[in-house]
Curated annotation (Swiss-Prot):
Complex I is composed of about 40 different subunits. Belongs to the peripheral arm of the complex, most likely the globular part. One of its GO terms (cellular component) is respiratory chain complex I. It comes from Neurospora crassa (strain ATCC 24698 / 74-OR23-1A / CBS 708.71 / DSM 1257 / FGSC 987). It comes from the Eukaryota. This is NADH-ubiquinone oxidoreductase 14.8 kDa subunit. Accessory subunit of the mitochondrial membrane respiratory chain NADH dehydrogenase (Complex I), that is believed to be not involved in catalysis. Complex I functions in the transfer of electrons from NADH to the respiratory chain. The immediate electron acceptor for the enzyme is believed to be ubiquinone. The precise function of this subunit is unknown but believed to be important.
């Protein structure tokens, strides 16, 4: 599978108004959702496509109430950069699984949260 670094590249720009920003956010969201099956096969994720799409939606919902246009533009730029890194296979499976703490093969609680908890569990 040849990698073309500029295949998913998009030039950065500022949104003219809120409707333009909304259109750009929906376009980015659709790009992420449409590429979910390809991401699952590329990274051999042991998760169904519906779980991956739900997690993508949660990431977009986290920034739903941002009310400053320059902040939305920065989030769009970061979203496009993440999409490009993901689709060009510049990440590893552990990077992708870090978004899924509940389903992660590493486990959410690897180390105790405090010294006392670790001491009582017999860990260093």
């Amino acid at each position: 599978m040849p990698i073309t670094p500029t295949k998913y590249a998009i030039t950065t720009r500022q949104s003219a108004n809120w409707s333009d920003a909304k259109r750009r956010v929906f376009a980015l969201y659709r790009r992420w959702l449409r590429s979910t099956p390809e991401m699952q096969s590329m990274y051999s994720l042991p998760l169904p496509i519906s779980v991956i799409r739900t997690r993508i939606r949660q990431e977009f919902e986290r920034n739903r109430f941002v009310n400053k246009l320059p902040v939305v533009d920065v989030l769009l730029t970061k979203g496009h950069a993440d999409y490009q890194e993901t689709m060009n296979f510049w990440r590893q499976t552990t990077h992708m699984m870090s978004y899924f703490n509940e389903e992660s093969f590493r486990g959410a609680k690897r180390l105790p949260s405090s010294f006392i908890d670790g001491f009582l569990q017999g860990r260093n």
